Amino acid sequence: MSYYFKNLQPGVDESSSEDELEQMLHGKQRADDASSEDDELSSLTFGSLKKAEDALQREEAHEAVHNRARAEARPRGSARSRQEASDSEDSSDSEAGFFEEDDRRRASGARRHKHAPSEQSAKRPVSKVRQIPGLESARREEPQPDIRFDKSLGRAEDLAKVRSNYRFLDDYRQQEISELSALLADKKFLRKASEREVQQLQQRLTSMRSRLQTVQNRDTERQVLRDYERSINQGNKTKFHLKKSEQKKVVQKWKFDHMKARQRDKVMERKRKKLRGKEFRSFEFHRK
């Protein structure tokens, strides 16, 4: 029985069987061609293969030179069009990267925990002074200014009026000074306290005394000037006010008159030394 009758099957079309037969024949022919090509390649020598490789390299180099010359000979419009095309490609790539980064940020934000540490872009330079959340700044540690004495929040207050309103604070200052003096005079406390604590308390006591003495001296000077102006304006219809320089002279005269003899001698000696130094510096050999 022939091959054709062996492959006959009921319910199968003859055209499909013929197509299968042709495919089998073509596949056999391709296999024969491939085997013949392999035989031809195996029979080639190394010299002929080297010549073929050199010829291919020369042809590729010639083609590259030709393409370069043709690209240089193109008009500027084509270069501009190529630049626009490359710019459009770059912009499309950047837009794609932007949207991808946005998607990543949105996805990371959805998974972000409320106690996670804060993130910052590495593209921005880090400032020398950084605001660290949760860390107390030095500004908060400073005492808040009293708005009653802030000139930017209202009119300038008269210092004499402010002093008269808060004169009662002198009693509290004097009480603190007496308590601190008694504490430093206590021998039991001095034995228990360290040397550093004792020095700090002594400095605090000196500062409090100096502050209270300064306030009292200002009150005295203000009272002296008030009495002097009242005396010179006693019979005048228009009030006469002293200049700053005259006020200073009046205050110095009052202090000098109310000093003790020993204090007056010390003041005069300091003034003589001051004048002597000024005259000595004014000599010719001290000038450049």
Curated annotation (Swiss-Prot):
Residues 23-33, 50-85, 137-150 have a biased composition (Basic and acidic residues). One of its GO terms (biological process) is maturation of SSU-rRNA from tricistronic rRNA transcript (SSU-rRNA, 5.8S rRNA, LSU-rRNA). The keyword Cytoplasm does not apply. Residues 184-219 form a coiled coil. The keyword Nucleotide-binding does not apply. It comes from the Eukaryota. Pfam families: RRP36. Associates with 90S and pre-40S pre-ribosomal particles. This is rRNA biogenesis protein RRP36. It comes from Eremothecium gossypii (strain ATCC 10895 / CBS 109.51 / FGSC 9923 / NRRL Y-1056). The gene is RRP36.
